[in-house]
Amino acid sequence: MRDRLDLLAHDKPIPMHPDKPTYLRPIFEPDCARLGVAALEAGRVPPLVVNWTGDETVSIEEYCTYMAELMGKEPIFKYTSEGTWASLVPDTTFMHEVLGRAEVHWRDGCRALVEQCYPELLKR
């Protein structure tokens, strides 16, 4: 997400997979920290493999448009299969059982990222 934010902030095209929209489940720093502690507590031998992800499904186009709006910008999407991937929406059932749920709403996480990385561009 940070790479796309940097492109937005500098008015550069964002490479996107041509199978649009591209959905994923972003996870943000507070959830990574909290779920990281839960992962350490769940550790065992042999290792337990748990994928981490956010709980909300959102398109890259939607969250980029939202972050661009926060900065008073328009996103520029460049659809290409080179260096991009299609939607990735993993099942969170096992993560919920072992680690718990992600709690940060994607809009709140995006806003926090803009505030942290580009506070001078944030429209108040």
Feature annotation, model-predicted:
Residues M1-L24, E29:
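NAD(P)-dependent short-chain dehydrogenase/reductase
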Residues W106-R124:
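Amphipathic terminal alpha-helices
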Residues R2, P30, R34, D108-R111:
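Short, contiguous clusters of charged residues that form electrostatic/catalytic patches at enzyme active sites
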Residues L7-D11, A39-G43, Q116, E120:
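Generic structural signal for alpha-helix termini and adjacent loop/cap motifs
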